[in-house]
Amino acid sequence: MSISSDEVNFLVYRYLQESGFSHSAFTFGIESHISQSNINGALVPPAALISIIQKGLQYVEAEVSINEDGTLFDGRPIESLSLIDAVMPDVVQTRQQAYRDKLAQQQQAAAAAAAAAAAAAATSANNQQPPAKNGESTANGEENGGHALANNHTDMMEVDGDVEIPPSKAVVLRGHESEVFICAWNPVSDLLASGSGDSTARIWNLSENSTSGSTQLVLRHCIREGGQDVPSNKDVTSLDWNSEGTLLATGSYDGFARIWTKDGNLASTLGQHKGPIFALKWNKKGNFILSAGVDKTTIIWDAHTGEAKQQFPFHSAPALDVDWQSNNTFASCSTDMCIHVCKLGQDRPIKTFQGHTNEVNAIKWDPTGNLLASCSDDMTLKIWSMKHDTCVHDLQAHNKEIYTIKWSPTGPGTNNPNANLMLASASFDSTVRLWDVDRGICIHTLTKHQEPVYSVAFSPDGRYLASGSFDKCVHIWNTQTGALVHSYRGTGGIFEVCWNAAGDKVGASASDGSVCVLDLRK
């Protein structure tokens, strides 16, 4: 038997990821140097740690229940143990002695019952009553039956059958060999990109004229070793299409960003980060790519040459998210609790926002680029303006960490100028909230999810919001009324949801390696 600390650490790291503890997984991965291990994560099946623990538990159960000669202990079947029971000292001897004591009590009780039965046999013969006919029932029986039926419910939140998306309207795409962290629709066609822990991204063709159904292109992320390309065996952590839909950028735990054509060909490999990449975005013009990494830096890349235009080393801890304000100005956030606004060509931030008291998970500029929203593990959502040094709104309603935020594509500067601007926040408290930022109030609290919510996305017209949670559900909400209008339960925890450009399909990526596409057309 051979067990290394690297192997144990990797299984713990994967368990944290699969269970939705993304921040814990990140911290543990850094401290245990997971990125430097040679373990091929694509070959390790999901739930590997749980599987090996279950086998160990079964071994202890066998120890309790089986004698040294292989026979069942006192003829009984294998006893079920909890995990905590199994690690207790002397569990085998303790359980076997407890069973001996119980067996002795049962034998004594059986002897007493037999004597009582013999004594009552004579009198019972004189007091027999005819048995009830088939089909007869007592009033008490009816009452108990009704009570049992009334209480036959589950803890799972009930969803109205009218809003459930039928299987005929859901396409489940299989191919990834590990959890799928991210997905994004091409902005001009029905191509869906996905990124996974199996060190691949994939492009799925969901268009009506696809000749062979939903075809997939596999984008394998490789690194150079010994003069040849070998799989990186690292998670694909981020991806983004350019505005024309011709190029896909991906970021990986191997520290490289890559640019691919929509046909799946590798166009460029961008290598200057000194560790995993956590976020990556194209600017609107399509000439620059922005990335954020664990090395505490952000980098603007020239998309045409693949060269780094400028590296910004201003954070004191890993950078978690980035968002463009304009074609050459952006904001970044970090576990250092700070937000920096930087501009290409400037050697220091043009603005720094401070006020969060825990790591800042996500940032997003509103459609006009005037307001910046941020969310944090401090359970607050803050709104910032370049005209002020402190936040203009400090929104406190969630009671657990806020994982992500999205602005609606409505209001000034959008294709829906007459609709009100809204902000959505998704939290580990299992709720989604919709905010009127102008007034600084929560207008809807969406509460059907049962587990942490990892992703929200507005439809292109802003009328609907999709949310995805680790409860395996994708919910579609009416943003005006807060009503649930569609619901789908998948086969794995949902990491990401996204709308296609036409607003009639929702893509979702899941922890079990599946990608599902929901067709919302009537």
Curated annotation (Swiss-Prot):
<feature type="domain" description="F-box-like">
    <location>
        <begin position="41"/>
        <end position="86"/>
    </location>
</feature>
<dbReference type="GO" id="GO:0003714">
    <property type="term" value="F:transcription corepressor activity"/>
</dbReference>
<dbReference type="Pfam" id="PF00400">
    <property type="entry name" value="WD40"/>
</dbReference>
<dbReference type="InterPro" id="IPR015943">
    <property type="entry name" value="WD40/YVTN_repeat-like_dom_sf"/>
</dbReference>
<dbReference type="InterPro" id="IPR006594">
    <property type="entry name" value="LisH"/>
</dbReference>
<dbReference type="InterPro" id="IPR019775">
    <property type="entry name" value="WD40_repeat_CS"/>
</dbReference>
<feature type="repeat" description="WD 8">
    <location>
        <begin position="489"/>
        <end position="522"/>
    </location>
</feature>
<feature type="compositionally biased region" description="Polar residues">
    <location>
        <begin position="123"/>
        <end position="141"/>
    </location>
</feature>
<feature type="region of interest" description="Disordered">
    <location>
        <begin position="122"/>
        <end position="150"/>
    </location>
</feature>
<dbReference type="Pfam" id="PF08513">
    <property type="entry name" value="LisH"/>
</dbReference>
<keyword id="KW-0677">Repeat</keyword>
<feature type="repeat" description="WD 4">
    <location>
        <begin position="314"/>
        <end position="352"/>
    </location>
</feature>
<feature type="repeat" description="WD 6">
    <location>
        <begin position="397"/>
        <end position="445"/>
    </location>
</feature>
<keyword id="KW-0678">Repressor</keyword>
<keyword id="KW-0833">Ubl conjugation pathway</keyword>
<comment type="similarity">
    <text>Belongs to the WD repeat EBI family.</text>
</comment>
<feature type="repeat" description="WD 7">
    <location>
        <begin position="448"/>
        <end position="487"/>
    </location>
</feature>
<dbReference type="GO" id="GO:0006357">
    <property type="term" value="P:regulation of transcription by RNA polymerase II"/>
</dbReference>
<comment type="function">
    <text>F-box-like protein which acts as an integral component of the N-CoR transcriptional corepressor complex. Probably regulates transcription activation mediated by nuclear receptors. May mediate the recruitment of the 19S proteasome complex, leading to the subsequent proteasomal degradation of the N-CoR complex, thereby allowing cofactor exchange and transcription activation.</text>
</comment>
<keyword id="KW-0010">Activator</keyword>
<feature type="repeat" description="WD 3">
    <location>
        <begin position="272"/>
        <end position="311"/>
    </location>
</feature>
<dbReference type="InterPro" id="IPR001680">
    <property type="entry name" value="WD40_rpt"/>
</dbReference>
<feature type="repeat" description="WD 1">
    <location>
        <begin position="175"/>
        <end position="214"/>
    </location>
</feature>
<dbReference type="InterPro" id="IPR020472">
    <property type="entry name" value="G-protein_beta_WD-40_rep"/>
</dbReference>
<dbReference type="InterPro" id="IPR045183">
    <property type="entry name" value="Ebi-like"/>
</dbReference>
<keyword id="KW-0539">Nucleus</keyword>
<keyword id="KW-0805">Transcription regulation</keyword>
<keyword id="KW-0156">Chromatin regulator</keyword>
<keyword id="KW-0804">Transcription</keyword>
<keyword id="KW-0853">WD repeat</keyword>
<dbReference type="GO" id="GO:0006325">
    <property type="term" value="P:chromatin organization"/>
</dbReference>
<feature type="repeat" description="WD 2">
    <location>
        <begin position="231"/>
        <end position="270"/>
    </location>
</feature>
<feature type="repeat" description="WD 5">
    <location>
        <begin position="355"/>
        <end position="394"/>
    </location>
</feature>
<comment type="subunit">
    <text>Interacts with heterodimers of rxra and thrb, and this interaction is abrogated by thyroid hormone binding to thrb. Interacts with ncor1.</text>
</comment>
<feature type="domain" description="LisH">
    <location>
        <begin position="4"/>
        <end position="36"/>
    </location>
</feature>
<dbReference type="GO" id="GO:0000118">
    <property type="term" value="C:histone deacetylase complex"/>
</dbReference>
<protein>
    <recommendedName>
        <fullName>F-box-like/WD repeat-containing protein TBL1XR1-B</fullName>
    </recommendedName>
</protein>
<dbReference type="InterPro" id="IPR036322">
    <property type="entry name" value="WD40_repeat_dom_sf"/>
</dbReference>
